[in-house]
């Protein structure tokens, strides 16, 4: 017999822990009790017009005091009979008292079951199988009461002589107020059948039952449901020759329906059979609940009740109809607040349904038939704020909905259910009808004819079947519902200032979970095969506004049928709606003018098309496999602002699938394919550019399409075409698997480029793919027109700006306290500076040219988001909306005579509201130019957006607005005019978006833009391309010495010579830079890197322009083997100058033969005195040549962030914590080395595309023979490059290698060589990888001759390492500080693109070996409940460990911040995972010293998930052997609650065993068998000593989780009294379990703990 559920694990908030108010009523009525159902939730006090408004109608529960005056049982009674209740008569009112356990039986004085009027249960009643009916008028389960029934229950009318009136119409029926209800039927009654013929069905499940089928279902009748008979028909039947077939009794007369059957339609694909044994005396009885009451009955469950209903039938017991709710109203006395003087009884009381459940976290309904077809009800099932699992059930109703999921019901799981609906008749809903426009106060929803009506998007529908509904799944989102619920963290609709709700900023994206559900509907009720229509995910309606805007939206008055309807209820702003894995074969319609709709993995087939209105429409990883004609288009009826295709294939011609109108922000890159078979052999992997691209006049961009050829043998060509160029054929390169084309911008304006990929030999119009690239916009040079730095004019902060002059453009800023006459922002006097007649303004001052909406909020102290201190100063202030999603509006003065303007905006993303993306929208002159662009990330970053506006109306002011959630800040704004001397722009678009990704800071116009903002300089910044003069031949310098070197070139790079670097670092660590002046080797040779630049590759196709100004380079070099590089254009990010004079004086004193100087000029003013002792081994070092980069934090600094939880994220602070990678052996080569930036700069083209390059190479990519393999760490690989001179000229060649770094060592056996005509020279390369890395680098070869200028080419190295735990420190990023201990620091951060838990351990003499040993241990820990180690980096002073970081964070965070409301089942499931992890550690001889909530991390709260929680071993653990050998425990943050366990480990009686075991291990290193034996002996010794290391900690953890509180102070100590607070409200078995674990000596082992917890789970299920 199944174990009886005895307990309630959560705090019961009804009646227990709070007193109920007693309400007196007029004579004839039951007195009432009043409680606040929402008292466990925080109240939301809303004020409007200085009045507090609050609706208590839904919060307050009034229920009749029906148990008053009942007859209580005799204490200790075991059986439910007349003798157990003294004085009980027929129709008595009875009470089973608390602590009494009774079993129902008839006879021996038992009360007849049809004579119970009222039964109240505080104890336990068990009704066994075999009872025909348990008749009762009112069944009331009070807090703590338990009813377990395997027999049927029938509700009857209340005895008028022994009852009063119930004003709220709960009874007749059942009310459960915080108790436990278990209704378990023994036999399955619902089966899916297959039609064989008109009167024969096959039931596959009967094959499993076999010959017992006849006995189980003997004498039954069947009720058959299908899409043609959604109301069902009851038939007699007999078994066929085989037990899996049933024969129906036929009749030609429909009047015999109910005893015989009409034929089954051949079009019925979904047939459900319900074996109905309800009224039969023979055969197996059915377990059901029904009603004979003349006024109806209902089941009302609340108060965190435990509910389990299986294999039961609920037959037509609901009361609430599908008309307007009409609730009972109480008229209270003015003098006595608890006295009701009159009652207006409601005619249609809400929530009196077949089954209404609220505030219950453990509800299981399985295999049930819920029938509600007597009258039009609102819904047979309604759930509010509950966790419900509904599966394998049949729900049949003549109602507004089969199921309504109200507020807070976020965890409903509907799986394998069959929903049949007789749609309601059209209601006379007019424009003024409240049912047509649901009020949030009435919750009058779900009347339309739905399968599932939900106010929560998290309702899951998996493999469900919906029959005959008007809308299978109807989702409604209401922004002001918290006024009713009181949920302080419940805001699925946007929370705006126009909503009633203010308390919560969280805006969840909506991700619908609809997997493989099926929808069938019929056009009418005529049983005609031709009238049946089957839709499998094929009609979708999404609505964003109330129905009063369009009468046609009223689904009750139309024959439209939808699988999914989404109504955003007119809320603005909108949100992201995501639909995954949808298969659509017909029209999809949406009306979401304020929202974004994303289809992910859409499979569009047959007649699919999309129509409606959405703000943003995205198709991701989708395919359109439809047969389109020239007149049929996907988007004929679509209105959208932005349309995005990402990796999406469309079958058909592009001319038939043109997307609708869109702003420039649209990413239109669909992939059209001609033949469905082509996808089996050829696919498109990547397209570049894959987003709108910006470029400047006469510049170039490399267009490319990468293909995945899976067996296509024919040659492929790619034809590039555009409105701005002639078509160009490009041969597909099978080696790079790309088609690449260098596109040169020769016209201004917007260019639509298309590539057609086809068979080279095909002469017809057939093709493989046609791809439209995103729009490419070509701009010209610009003049600064107006700007605005977002600093609060009321602030006392002064942003200084240096004086702009014609001879200096230094970007360094003055100190914050400096003032000068040319300061752009001076908030003391609100001064506006005019330079050359142009204005630059700080703050917004109406009288001086700009206006700002009053809702703008100034925010200072924004974090550094670039590598430039100047830009960081500029971006330190920003504005955002004071109310989220409220647009910030800016009116800025412009010159109306200028026709074309460029508008540049800088935004900083900082302190995200939650873990979801934050959308940004931008409009210019109220026209959208950026729509709901998602910003997301854990770290602050900056984004530059540049737009084009054509001022055709000659406006004086430009209106710019943006909206966000309040976590995106506009930090600066500038407007530029396009030069009139440039050609006319073609195809203007107003306005036009230009994202930052396409902006190259090295371009002259961007320099003008950024530096004009930074310096406030309004002077002309036209960047000219300087003509580079020919330098003297290199041979002249090699043959001469001690002679001044003259430079006539303007654009050159200074590359300084350094001694060969022998550490892993590719650039100096902070510790080196900060002490550079005291280092004689590095003195005056390493340029100061104040901005902490990181190295980054630059595009090969980008031409960099730079103007030097007054560069005086005095170099005294005493070096050898020096070379001069020239003709190399480059640029520093924060420099801009006009070259006037360039005097370079170099004096060289050489102490060796054949000496020459290396001195390549740069833009920086520098005096370099280089002294060396004649060492021939040098490498080249350069300053970083890059523009500022988003999220630039140097790898040699680690952030210290004073934050524990994500929602307490504070301003970044940085600590100079040098992380110097360990040194390795010196290189043997003496190569010239520099960074990839200089290599890219110097190499003017790839040799394969440079037809004039005279050298030929045997390979272009050095792979070291690892094309299809990966390199092992620490192993050296070799490769040879053969170079052949195909010309008639002798060349001198120089090899320039990339800089060494800690991830790899790359060397060559030669640094230079001579190569005569026809000669071949070989260079041997070697590489050694030191960590998990992808060493994809470039190296350059420069050749020189007496007859021609020097030439460059670029080759590549591509080597990837095998996976390991040794990480590349450049991939590790530190974010927020979690904990700091005496010798270790714990961070949250990332490793690559993965979230990680990062731990720094100080490596000192006393614990260095300890750390290595623990690293070795942790790397071997592989268990699903142990937080896995990603890898590590070892430096000179630190060991950095990276662990996997789970998505839900730590248990401590969830408990302390009340982030999740978990059921008892979920909590026990988490404890099981923790126990599994601890058991594994114990078996591995590891003591987890930090077992507490902060070291338990959650992955999932679904109790059916494979893994819910993992234990983090913070490497404070010690092996047992290590503890005994060292005979001490490092007490670093040792938890207080482990004191007792440590004393057990230190037990002297055990030390000898440990020491002997360890000594034995140490003395037998040469004998593996002895070692193994000794290890086993040690483990046996450990087991025999019964050390229960973490039991007490586990008890504390369990206690904290169950009571939802984190213990502090002495309450955690071992030796304290066993806990009692909160335990009196949970199951006594759980309480005993915690008490037993509280003492680790007498407690369980983890094996026993797991068994106990699994027993708890089994009892709950």
UniProtKB/Swiss-Prot annotation:
Entry note about domains: The protein kinase domain is predicted to be catalytically inactive.
GO annotations of cellular component type: membrane
Biased composition (Low complexity): 1101-1175, 1555-1584
The protein, known as: Probable inactive serine/threonine-protein kinase gdt1
Organism superkingdom: Eukaryota
Range of residues in the leader sequence: 1-20
Transmembrane segments annotated in the record for this chain: 1008-1028
Topological region Cytoplasmic: 1029-1661
Consequence of gene loss (knockout): Cells overexpress discoidin and initiate multicellular development prematurely.
């Amino acid at each position: 017999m199944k174990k009886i559920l005895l307990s309630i694990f959560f705090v019961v908030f009804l009646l227990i822990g709070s007193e109920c108010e007693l309400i007196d009523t007029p004579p004839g009525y039951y007195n009432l009790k009043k409680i606040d159902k929402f008292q466990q939730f925080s109240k939301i006090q809303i004020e409007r017009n200085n009045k507090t408004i609050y609706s208590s109608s839904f919060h307050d529960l009034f229920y009749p005091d029906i148990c008053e005056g009942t007859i209580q049982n005799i204490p200790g009674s075991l059986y439910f009979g007349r003798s157990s209740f003294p004085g009980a008569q027929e129709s008595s009112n009875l009470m089973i008292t608390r602590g009494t356990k009774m079993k129902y039986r008839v006879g021996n004085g038992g009360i007849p079951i049809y004579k119970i009027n009222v039964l109240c249960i505080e104890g336990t009643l068990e009704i066994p199988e075999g009872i025909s009916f348990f008749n009762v008028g009112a069944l009331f389960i009070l807090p703590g009461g338990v009813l377990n029934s395997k027999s049927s229950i029938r509700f009857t009318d209340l005895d008028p002589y022994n009852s009063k009136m119930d004003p709220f119409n709960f009874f007749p029926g059942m009310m459960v107020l915080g108790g436990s209800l278990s209704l378990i039927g023994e036999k399955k009654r619902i089966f899916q059948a297959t039609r064989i013929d008109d009167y024969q069905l096959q039931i596959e499940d009967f094959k499993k039952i076999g010959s017992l089928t006849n006995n189980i279902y003997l004498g039954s009748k069947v009720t058959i449901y299908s899409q043609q008979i959604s109301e069902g028909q009851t038939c007699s039947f007999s078994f066929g020759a085989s037990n899996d077939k049933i024969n129906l009794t036929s009749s030609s007369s429909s009047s015999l329906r109910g005893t015989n059957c009409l034929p089954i339609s051949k079009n019925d694909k979904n047939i459900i059979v319900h074996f109905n044994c309800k009224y039969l005396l023979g055969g197996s009885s059915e377990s059901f609940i029904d009603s004979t009451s003349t006024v109806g009955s209902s089941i009302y469950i609340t108060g965190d009740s435990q509910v389990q209903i299986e294999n039961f039938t609920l037959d037509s017991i609901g009361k609430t109809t599908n008309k307007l709710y009409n609730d009972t109203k109480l008229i209270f006395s003015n003098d006595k607040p608890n006295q009701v003087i009159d009652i207006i009884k409601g005619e249609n009381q809400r929530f009196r349904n077949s089954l209404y459940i609220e505030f219950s976290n453990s509800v299981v309904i399985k295999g049930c038939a819920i029938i509600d077809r007597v009258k039009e009800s609102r819904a047979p099932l309604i759930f509010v704020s509950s966790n419900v699992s509904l599966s394998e059930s049949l729900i049949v109703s003549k109602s507004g909905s089969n199921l309504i999921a109200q507020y807070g019901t976020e965890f409903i799981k509907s799986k394998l259910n069959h929903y049949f609906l007789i749609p309601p008749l059209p209601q006379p809903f007019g424009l003024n009808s409240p049912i047509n426009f649901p009020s949030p106060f009435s919750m009058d929803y779900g009347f339309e004819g739905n399968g599932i009506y939900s106010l929560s998007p998290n309702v899951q529908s998996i493999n469900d079947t919906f029959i005959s509904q008007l809308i299978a799944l109807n989702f409604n989102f209401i922004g002001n519902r918290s006024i009713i619920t009181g949920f302080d963290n419940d805001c699925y609709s946007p929370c705006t200032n126009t909503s009633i709700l203010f308390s919560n900023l969280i805006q969840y994206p909506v991700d619908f979970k609809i997997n493989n559900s099926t929808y069938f509907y019929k056009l009418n009720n005529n049983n005609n095969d031709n009238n049946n229509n089957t839709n499998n995910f094929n009609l979708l309606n999404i609505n964003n506004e109330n129905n009063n805007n369009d009468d046609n939206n009223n689904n009750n008055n139309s024959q439209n049928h939808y699988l999914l309807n989404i109504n955003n209820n007119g809320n603005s702003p909108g949100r992201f709606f995501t639909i995954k894995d949808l298969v659509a074969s017909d029209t999809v319609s949406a009306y979401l003018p304020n929202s974004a709709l994303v289809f992910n993995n859409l499979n569009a087939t047959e007649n699919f098309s999309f129509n409606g209105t959405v703000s943003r429409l995205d198709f991701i990883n989708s395919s359109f496999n439809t047969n389109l004609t020239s007149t049929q288009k996907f988007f004929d009826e679509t209105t959208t602002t932005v349309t995005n295709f990402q990796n999406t294939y469309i079958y058909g011609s592009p001319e038939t699938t043109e997307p609708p109108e869109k702003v420039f922000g649209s990413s239109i890159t669909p992939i059209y394919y001609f033949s469905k078979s082509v996808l089996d052999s050829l696919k498109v992997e990547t397209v570049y550019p894959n987003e709108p691209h910006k470029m400047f006049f006469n510049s170039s961009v490399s267009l490319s399409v990468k293909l995945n050829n899976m067996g296509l043998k024919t040659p492929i060509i790619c034809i590039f075409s555009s409105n701005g160029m002639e078509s160009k054929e490009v041969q597909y390169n099978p080696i790079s698997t790309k088609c690449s084309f260098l596109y040169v911008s020769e016209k201004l304006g917007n260019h639509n480029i298309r590539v057609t990929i086809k068979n080279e030999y095909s002469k017809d119009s057939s093709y493989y793919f046609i791809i439209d690239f995103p729009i490419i916009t070509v701009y010209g040079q610009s003049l600064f027109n107006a700007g605005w730095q977002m600093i609060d004019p009321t602030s006392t902060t002064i942003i200084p700006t240096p004086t702009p002059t014609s001879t200096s453009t230094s970007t360094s800023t003055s100190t914050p306290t400096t003032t000068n006459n040319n300061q752009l922002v001076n908030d003391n006097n609100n001064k506006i500076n005019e330079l050359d007649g142009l204005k630059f303004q700080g703050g917004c001052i109406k009288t001086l040219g700009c206006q700002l909406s009053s809702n703008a909020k100034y925010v200072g102290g924004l974090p550094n988001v670039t590598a430039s201190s100047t830009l960081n100063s500029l971006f330190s202030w920003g504005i955002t909306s004071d109310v989220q999603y409220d647009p910030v509006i800016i009116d800025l003065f412009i010159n109306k005579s200028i026709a074309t303007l460029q508008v540049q905006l800088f935004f900083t993303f900082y302190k995200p509201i939650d873990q979801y993306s934050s959308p940004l929208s931008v409009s210019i002159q109220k026209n959208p130019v950026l729509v709901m662009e998602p910003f997301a990330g854990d770290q602050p970053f900056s984004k530059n957006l540049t737009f084009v506006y054509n001022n055709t109306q000659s406006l004086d002011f430009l209106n710019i607005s943006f909206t966000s959630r309040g976590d995106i800040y506009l930090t600066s704004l500038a407007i530029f005019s396009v030069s009139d001397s440039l050609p006319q722009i073609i195809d203007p678009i107003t306005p036009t978006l230009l994202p930052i990704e396409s902006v190259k800071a090295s371009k002259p116009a961007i320099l003008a833009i950024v530096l004009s903002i930074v310096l406030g300089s309004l002077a002309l910044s036209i960047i000219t391309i300087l003509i580079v003069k020919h330098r003297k031949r290199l041979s002249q310098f090699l043959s001469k010495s001690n002679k001044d070197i003259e430079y006539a070139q303007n654009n050159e790079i200074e590359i300084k010579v350094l001694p060969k670097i022998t550490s892993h670092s590719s650039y100096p660590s902070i510790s080196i830079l900060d002490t550079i002046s005291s280092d004689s080797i590095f003195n005056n040779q390493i340029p100061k890197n104040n901005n902490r630049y990181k190295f980054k590759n630059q595009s090969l196709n980008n031409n960099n322009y730079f103007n030097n100004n007054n560069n005086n380079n005095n170099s005294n070099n005493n070096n050898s083997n020096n070379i001069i590089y020239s003709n190399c254009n480059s640029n520093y990010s924060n420099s801009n100058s006009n070259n006037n004079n360039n005097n370079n004086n170099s004096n060289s004193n050489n102490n060796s033969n054949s000496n020459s100087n290396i001195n390549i000029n740069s833009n920086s003013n520098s005096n370099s005195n280089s002294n060396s002792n004649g060492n021939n081994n040098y490498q080249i070092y350069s300053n970083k040549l890059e523009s500022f980069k988003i999220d630039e934090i140097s790898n040699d600094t680690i952030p210290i962030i004073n934050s524990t939880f994500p929602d307490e994220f504070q301003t970044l602070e940085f600590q100079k914590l040098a992380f110097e990678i360990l040194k390795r052996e010196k290189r043997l080569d003496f190569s010239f080395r520099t960074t990839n930036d200089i290599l890219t700069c110097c190499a003017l083209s790839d040799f394969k595309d440079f037809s004039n390059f005279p050298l030929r190479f045997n390979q272009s990519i050095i792979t070291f023979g690892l094309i299809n393999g990966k390199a092992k760490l620490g192993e050296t690989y070799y490769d040879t490059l053969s170079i052949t001179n195909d010309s008639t000229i002798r060349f001198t060649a120089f090899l320039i290698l990339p800089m060494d770094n800690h991830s790899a060592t790359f060397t060559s056996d030669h640094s230079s060589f001579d190569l005569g005509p026809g000669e071949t020279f070989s260079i041997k390369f070697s590489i050694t990888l030191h960590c998990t890395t992808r060493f994809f680098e470039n190296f350059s070869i420069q050749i020189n001759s007496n007859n021609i200028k020097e030439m460059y080419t670029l080759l590549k190295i591509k080597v990837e390492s095998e996976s390991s735990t040794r990480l590349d420190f450049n991939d590790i990023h530190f974010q927020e500080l979690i904990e700091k201990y005496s010798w270790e620091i714990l961070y949250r951060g990332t490793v690559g693109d993965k979230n990680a838990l990062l731990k720094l351990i100080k490596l000192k003499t006393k614990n260095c070996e300890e750390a290595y040993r623990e690293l070795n241990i942790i790397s071997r820990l592989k268990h699903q409940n142990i937080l896995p180690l990603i890898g590590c980096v070892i430096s000179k002073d630190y060991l950095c460990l990276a662990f996997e970081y789970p998505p839900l964070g730590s248990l401590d965070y969830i408990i302390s911040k009340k982030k999740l409301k978990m059921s008892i089942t979920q909590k026990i499931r988490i404890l099981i995972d923790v126990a599994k992890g601890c058991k594994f550690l114990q078996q591995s001889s590891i003591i987890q010293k930090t077992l507490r909530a902060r070291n338990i991390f959650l992955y999932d709260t679904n109790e059916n998930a494979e893994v819910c929680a993992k234990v983090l071993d913070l490497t404070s653990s010690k092996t047992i052997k290590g503890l005994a050998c060292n005979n001490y425990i490092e007490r670093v943050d040792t938890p207080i609650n482990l004191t007792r366990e440590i004393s057990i480990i230190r037990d002297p009686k055990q030390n000898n065993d440990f020491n002997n075991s360890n000594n034995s291990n140490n003395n037998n290193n040469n004998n593996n068998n002895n070692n193994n034996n000794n290890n086993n002996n040690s483990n046996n010794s450990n087991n025999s000593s019964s050390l229960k290391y973490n039991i007490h900690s586990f008890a504390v953890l369990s206690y904290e989780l169950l009571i939802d509180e984190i213990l502090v102070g002495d309450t955690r100590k071992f030796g304290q009294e066993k806990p009692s607070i909160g335990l009196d409200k949970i199951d006594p078995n759980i309480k005993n379990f915690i008490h037993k674990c509280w003492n680790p000596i007498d407690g369980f082992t983890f094996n026993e703990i797991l068994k106990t917890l699994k027993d708890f789970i089994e009892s709950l299920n």
